[in-house]
């Protein structure tokens, strides 16, 4: 692991890749808080079908985020990937870009199909983990993170902006 300072940071990373379900949501919230990324939990169990989060990155419009985690090595399918679109429409975020975080991964047929939508991307946990690590290191700004996430299709580590010195 790269320059991860302290046991708490290492635990964040380990939990991010290991946990599923509600525990995964909690570690996701902890990481956002640690990185000082503003978010609002929308799915508080009082609103039927609400998306999970509204993420507010610096100098960027809000993003509606849905977390989909699967047990073992199962992949998030098309239907689960696009649920966030309906949830965002119903709950008043019809103009917001939507992201489905697929943990551990997304079915490979999904990104090409959803790219035409123009308002949705999927990101696998390993790719988002790399991006968040770069935010922590200061080599990726929140605005750059937004631009990377808000590109229709799939947000891949290979597409992250690199820092020139």
Where are these regions (language model features)?
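Feature for intrinsically disordered/low-complexity regulatory segments and propeptides
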Residues: 1-10
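Catalytic core segments in nucleotide and nucleic-acid processing enzymes
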Residues: 11-165
């Amino acid at each position: 692991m790269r320059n991860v300072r302290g046991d708490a940071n290492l635990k964040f990373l380990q939990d991010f890749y290991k946990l599923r379900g509600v525990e995964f949501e909690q570690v996701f919230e902890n990481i956002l808080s640690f990185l000082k990324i503003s978010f609002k939990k929308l799915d508080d169990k009082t609103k039927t079908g609400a998306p999970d989060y509204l993420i507010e990155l610096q100098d960027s419009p809000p993003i509606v985020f849905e977390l989909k985690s699967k047990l073992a090595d199962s992949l998030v399918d098309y239907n689960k990937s696009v649920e966030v679109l309906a949830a965002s429409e119903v709950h008043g975020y019809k103009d917001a870009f939507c992201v489905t975080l697929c943990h551990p991964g997304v079915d490979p047929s999904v990104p090409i199909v959803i790219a035409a939508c123009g308002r949705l991307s999927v990101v696998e946990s390993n790719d988002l983990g790399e991006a968040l690590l770069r935010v922590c290191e200061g080599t990726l700004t929140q605005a750059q993170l937004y631009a990377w996430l808000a590109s229709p299709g799939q947000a891949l580590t290979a597409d992250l902006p690199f820092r020139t010195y």
